[in-house]
Design a protein with these regions (language model features):
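Extreme N-terminal starter segment of soluble prokaryotic enzymes
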Residues: 1-2
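Glycine-rich phosphate- or other oxyanion-binding loops that anchor nucleotides, phosphorylated ligands
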Residues: 9-177
Length: 177
C-alpha cells in the first residue's frame, strides 16, 4: 500500500509511521507522473489518495470516500462530445466497485459551479484512478472537505488544509490496522 498526497500541508511522511507516503505536487500531470513512478518502482497492490477537496453539495462535509472519478475540465464540446467525456474513449467515468461519492478532477481551483456536476472537486484523483485502473491496481480515495467550491473557497482551503489529517489517520488505522 502506498499513499499519494499532493502537499505536505495535507499529510507528512512522518504522520503514519511504517506506511509509505509520497508527495506528488498539485494537478493531474504531477499526479500522473508520481503514480507511474510509484507503480514502476514499487508494484503496489493498492494506492490510496488522500487530500482536500471542495464540495458542490452543502450537505457533504468532513472526511469522505470518492469512488467515481470524472475529468471535469475535458471539453471537446465543439466535436459534439459532452463536457467531461474524453473523445474516442469507451467510458468517461472511472469506478472502483465501492459505494462512495463522485469526484470531478481538473487543473483549476474551483470557486464557482463547474459545468460537470459531481459531489466533490479536486485536482489529482482522476489521473491516479485512471492509471491504477489501466494497471489493475486497487485504488481508494479519501478527501477532506476543505471548502464549498464557492467565492470563499481559496480562503476556506487555506484555513482547513491541515484539518483532515487526524481523521484520515484514524480511518487508515480503522481499515488497515
Amino acid at each position: 500500500m502506498i499513499i499519494l498526497v499532493a502537499l505536505e500541508d495535507e499529510l507528512t511522511k512522518e504522520d503514519l509511521n511504517g506506511l509509505q507516503i509520497e508527495h506528488m505536487g498539485v494537478g493531474k500531470i504531477n499526479a500522473a507522473i508520481k503514480t507511474t513512478e510509484v507503480i514502476r518502482n514499487h508494484s503496489p497492490e493498492l494506492i490510496i489518495n488522500y487530500g482536500t477537496a471542495g464540495s458542490l453539495n452543502k450537505d457533504i462535509s468532513g472526511l469522505v470516500e470518492a469512488t467515481n472519478f470524472y475529468q471535469r475540465d475535458m471539453d471537446a464540446s465543439p466535436l459534439g462530445i459532452k463536457v467531461g467525456e474524453t473523445p474516442f474513449e469507451d467510458s468517461f467515468k472511472i469506478h472502483f466497485g465501492r459505494d462512495g461519492l463522485s469526484c470531478g478532477t481538473g487543473d483549476s481551483f474551483v470557486t464557482n459551479t463547474p459545468e460537470l456536476i459531481t459531489d466533490l472537486v479536486d485536482m489529482e484523483a482522476y489521473a491516479i484512478a485512471k492509471i491504477c485502473k489501466m494497471n489493475d491496481i486497487d485504488f481508494r480515495c479519501f478527501k477532506y472537505i476543505s471548502d464549498q467550491a464557492d467565492d470563499n473557497a481559496s480562503q476556506d482551503w487555506k484555513e482547513n488544509v491541515a484539518r483532515g489529517k487526524e481523521l484520515f489517520i484514524e480511518k487508515i488505522k480503522e481499515i488497515y490496522g
